[in-house]
């Protein structure tokens, strides 16, 4: 790398950082008084109130499907998959809940499929299909509502890496496919990628869980200069699962490291410092590359901390894309263009950067990405309900006729058919 090239990068970055730092405090303060309006219909959708637009009936399942799992291993409450737990708790006291199933628009089955953890705290999805099948068998035998639609008016929260494909490696997730019993149900999931077998039409893509209280505790003064140009902490290689280094993240993270490990504009490392949240608030751009799956909590953290997300995940379907203007607040870089990332970011007009920061300062934008306890207006819980409300009324044909083809209860891998 020539010294003239490095000098040009540093000069360009210095201009951006100086302008962003000077304007960041002003943008944050302005956001508190007068946030920039989100353009188009997205702003209206983001602030929709779902109350009065739908009613949800919650099945009363035996505790072994939910609460006992958390009691056995409370670490589930802090995992990035914890949305399935907090969604259940939210709905129990929500104004959209109905105790009369005959007036319900939607039926919710509170089954926790991500609470089987290793000693290291990693979720094991291998029992998840059996847990889900068992829960569906239970509701189909105890109530008549599943059988009249084969689940078409039911929704399930499935926050696994690849949703209801229930595997953390893409190749095996594709091989498994979505659990056959969920083919007609609406899936609320973190995984989103266009034209992928693990994302069926009509699914609602949501953010992963990131602990709101923990992030709140690490807030720094809003007028703190953003003195870091590009920031990332995480794996570049997963040597345990991908010794060759070409499959993990489709090689995008390896490319990041090989191209920019010595670039002074890029603060990237595998180290995860105690100042991680503070550092994101000091950065202009936060890298959000795919890992095994296209999504990660970094996306939530970047939005909450006002750091422009640089999304490196081809064909990703982002959370609440009909409400959050991702194209306006983020930067999209194709995986093949990672080697050009320095040029892409240093070439961005300063006015574009400042506008993205002003939009990110909008409190509604941040709130939509979070699952706070207790729930708050316009948070991720309410965005999920808005998504369900927009699917109403259910289309013709939701109620099955005697001549209609029913779901095959014996479809899928033999191991999934074992009793749980």
From Swiss-Prot:
Query: According to the lineage, what is the superkingdom?
Result: Eukaryota
Annotated membrane topology is: Single-pass type II membrane protein
Q: Which EC number(s) are documented for this chain?
A: 2.4.-.-
Q: What is its main location?
A: Golgi
As for subcellular location, the record says: Golgi apparatus membrane
Residues on Lumenal side: 26-420
Signal sequence span is none
Transmembrane ranges, per UniProt, are 5-25
Q: Which UniProt keywords apply?
A: Cell wall biogenesis/degradation, Glycoprotein, Glycosyltransferase, Golgi apparatus, Membrane, Signal-anchor, Transferase, Transmembrane, Transmembrane helix
Which enzyme class?
transferase
Gene Ontology terms, MF aspect: glycosyltransferase activity
Segments on the Cytoplasmic face = 1-4
Single biological process term from Gene Ontology: cell wall organization
Residues bearing carbohydrate: 147, 408
Q: Which GO terms describe its cellular component?
A: Golgi membrane
Claim: Manganese is one of the keywords in the record = no
Q: Which Pfam families does this one have?
A: Exostosin_GT47
Relate the protein's function as given in its record: Involved in the synthesis of glucuronoxylan hemicellulose in secondary cell walls.
Q: What family classification does the UniProt entry report for this protein?
A: Belongs to the glycosyltransferase 47 family.
Q: What is this protein called?
A: Probable glucuronosyltransferase Os04g0398600
Taxonomic lineage from the root: Eukaryota, Viridiplantae, Streptophyta, Embryophyta, Tracheophyta
